[in-house]
Amino acid sequence: MSSAYQPLTPALTEVNEAGHLASRQYGDVYNSPADAYGQAVDVFLHGNDLPQRWRGRRHFTVCETGFGLGTNFLALWRAWREDPGRCGRLHMLSIEGHPLTREAYEAVLDTQVPEPLRAGARELLAQWPKLLPGLHRLEFEHGAVTLTLALGDIGQVAPRLSACVDAFFLDGFAPSKNPAMWDTYVLRRLLRLGAADATLATWTSAGFVRRGLQEAGFDIQRLTGARGKRHITVGRRSAWAGKHAPRRTDAPDAPVLVVGAGLAGAGMAQALALRGLSVRVIAESAQPHGGHLAAALTPLVARDDNARARLARAGSQRAWHRWQGLDAVRKVGALQLERDAGRSAALADTLAALHFPRDWVRWVESDEAEQLAGLPVARGGLYFADGLLVRPQPLIDALLAWPGIERVRGRVSRLVQCSAGQWQALDALGQVLGEARQVVLANAAGTPLVLEASGLLGPLPRVAQMHALAGEVSHVPAAALGGGPHCMIGGEGYVLPAVDGWCVVGSTYAPGVAQSEVSLAGQQRNLEKAAGLLGAPLDAVAGPLPGWAGWRAVMPGRLPVLGELPGVSGVWLASAYGSRGLSWSALAGDVIAARLCGEPLPLETDLLASVGPR
């Protein structure tokens, strides 16, 4: 396992003799015994000149250390709701090393969360994430208020965050109880995110903390405290440090062009439209997944928790939150099986080493696997309770129906930069299909073709390796599979629950072919894969079967390409999703939309680097 991987350990709590929730890990209380709500307002809001500083702003970003019970977030949210002059959008980025489980938070909400904040806490509880390491984006007020929870050790998390922060709430357990959180190096790595005029506030006035904040580039003052605090500390970014600060970005006022209307383009367009942007989607085909009955969205695990596993985990979580309530998406669960007993044992060992929560993934023996599937299966494996069965084209149609999205039929052949930084998207005849300052190429294997014709591919050797890979699935009558499995069964191939009386079985990989089409040879390979998962041949299936064939855009390493072209302002890529278009769709859309709109990014910087265009 990678030495960088650290399992996420939930909070261990108890209620002390005074009735306050305390951490057994650190021996300190979560909330101020005097007045937790009042301290949140006096120290963190007023200490950062809030709400005055967000007035007249399109968006405002806060970064917090020590989420705990969410008291500071809830107080900030309440102040925003009550302020008629509030900013358009409010973002909080909060780091928590030992989060409470959903059950633990629910158990203490009515006794430990201050009464004025409990209504907000119940909304927070409804979105409480699975306790998985990484970033979790929660949205409130129809997306106008976002909370990005960064779960993990602050020493690992802080260097991987990307944001332009207006105010810091430095909370958490006392420096004497949890010195690692107040380490000078950690503070420096965190406070680098501050804008040129960023402020900070904290309830502690410990000398080494104040010195660390000064070393991190802040002018520090110790002020008289209140509500049980003798002194508090506030600060403003020093002029010398502000020269190196990240620059604020406001959302584009003009429309954004998205080239491609498949899973990549639809996810991108929806993410932009949700933020109030106008989007023009240009695509040749109105039904790129027509006839594709169903597909599976499942995470994956790797013993070293590598970039692909982390991205798949983040993508599946993002999709689940973004697509809830859509008719095209159904949570059915997913079994992941290996091809033999030896590989199964290795998979079980991997799961044990990673310490993921059982409500996200757990090991099941063959008997339980059969109960979950409702069919005989070859062996036990991993069970992901949140596995999603998706009808791809209805999902795409639902995403592209979002207000603010305009669809245009046409095939973009090249991009041309014209005056004032505008990009024109031209077809093969030179006709202008759209014009914008920001263009996202989300057209799968067509991406390198457009870049090459535009003179932009040369500096991108990785993108130049992108190619199309054919594949097909077979549609098996559900009656031939006892009505079909109750959950998705995957491994080397997959068998999906019935949709409209058919079970999708797949899939093939056919490199080097000129045409992707349904074939008897492909059907045979798919049925063989299904037999390997179910432990027996599909004898009830006879004759040619219907199916669906398409193309995957893939690159070496099986990772997508995501981000702005280096040195080329306004051209973005969201492509090479391969077999995991459902995994990357919502996440990639949010990453690029967040970058365009100046939000904290919902993905760690090392993962962004792994999928960058260069």
Curated annotation (Swiss-Prot):
Subcellular locations according to the entry: Cytoplasm
Listed EC numbers: 2.1.1.61, 1.5.-.-
Q: Does the keyword Oxidoreductase apply?
A: yes
- Write out the catalysed reaction: 5-aminomethyl-2-thiouridine(34) in tRNA + S-adenosyl-L-methionine = 5-methylaminomethyl-2-thiouridine(34) in tRNA + S-adenosyl-L-homocysteine + H(+)
Q: What is its main location?
A: cytoplasm
- Cross-referenced PANTHER family, in alphabetical order? SARCOSINE DEHYDROGENASE-RELATED, TRNA 5-METHYLAMINOMETHYL-2-THIOURIDINE BIOSYNTHESIS BIFUNCTIONAL PROTEIN MNMC
Q: Which family does it belong to?
A: In the N-terminal section; belongs to the methyltransferase superfamily. tRNA (mnm(5)s(2)U34)-methyltransferase family.
Q: What is this protein called?
A: tRNA 5-methylaminomethyl-2-thiouridine biosynthesis bifunctional protein MnmC
- The species is Bordetella avium (strain 197N)
Q: Which gene encodes it?
A: mnmC
